[in-house]
Amino acid sequence: MSFLRPLPQALRAEAARIGGLAARCLVLEVETWPKPGLVSHVDNGSHTDMDAGSFRRSAAAIEPFLARLALAGIEGASMPRLRAIGLEAEGAMLRATGGVNTHRGAIFGLGLLCAAAGARLKGAQGTLGDVVERLWGGEILGTPSAPDSHGGCAALRYGAGGARQEAAAGFPTLY
């Protein structure tokens, strides 16, 4: 167990690098244009409650948590631990944006990929999606989705699988 032996500084530095790269991806996403209806550095799209500045503040606020998720992956953490870190990240995001959800989905999906990248540093094999599916897929589906979330509403209304099923299956749309 990793709490009995401290992790080498090189692994801690790599986890921080993973978190930094993930946060940079979030900033680059908001700087991508055109994307009709979505927030960019050019306009707010169809949104009145968020802008590029709120996305940048959010990305900066959640960066340390993305690094912690990578570190948790290195340490072989279970889904409940990843979920707890994700909820802390969500709180930081909401504080940074005045209560606006800019990156809840990214905290979930990209956070899992950060954890998988960490697990690969300790020898997990396969794509990041393979690692997510193998290490946490069952646990992702083992808890009920929030019925008031967008994904929960879509699942009820359309029978769509949503982000949780996509993640649990190893992100087959990506891989």
PLM regions and their residue ranges:
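Phosphate-rich cofactor/ligand-interacting catalytic cores and adjacent structured alpha/beta frameworks
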Residues: M1-E75, M79-P80, A117-Y175
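Long, hydrophobic/aromatic-enriched structural stretches that serve as scaffold segments
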Residues: P64-A115
